[in-house]
Amino acid sequence: SGTRYVIEGGKEQSLEEMGAPEGTTFLIRNLFYNTPARSKFLKSDMTEAGYINTLMEQLALSHPEISFKYIQNRQVKLSSSGNYSVKDVIYSVYGREIAKALLEVSYENDFMKIEGFVGKPEISRGNRTFENYYINGRYVKNKIITKAIEDGYKGLVMQHKFPFVSLRIEMDGNDLDVNVHPAKREVRFARETEVYTAIYETVRK
């Protein structure tokens, strides 16, 4: 059994028990019906859908233990099994050609642990969209990590090309400042040099 919870315009409409499969399902309709002014600032439907799709990919990659299914306009855009395999999620998100061109990597020191996959040079791209890393289960961006990744690939990829990387990083919260940006996407490290070295060595080897 499960629970059906309906909210309209920020107000509770109903809360009732019902039969349901395991998991959580969100159905979102007419998101800006009561704030039409805000909807005017949105980009095209295709662009906004792309943002949502990217978010779902990030969630699936950072939490391979959870099964995700993203349906947009009755079409399945993403489906992951939740079997704890990051490589299986990469296959679901990026396809077979990417998944078969990966090398598994791992690294551990006294304050951080790194696991994940790096791509062979032939699957590098002309932008950084394939550079994904997650700290304590959260998708983030950080200049130190980006530099370490790209320095690690120097001499292996052509100029103006960027590698495929999917790294899961675990570290003590005391070594990490997540309050740099309201969305907590940007982070700072107390031990930047050691973080750089760890990422560089993980990628380079």
Model-derived features with residue positions:
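N-terminal phosphate-binding caps/lids of nucleotide- and nucleic-acid-binding domains
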Residues: 1-205
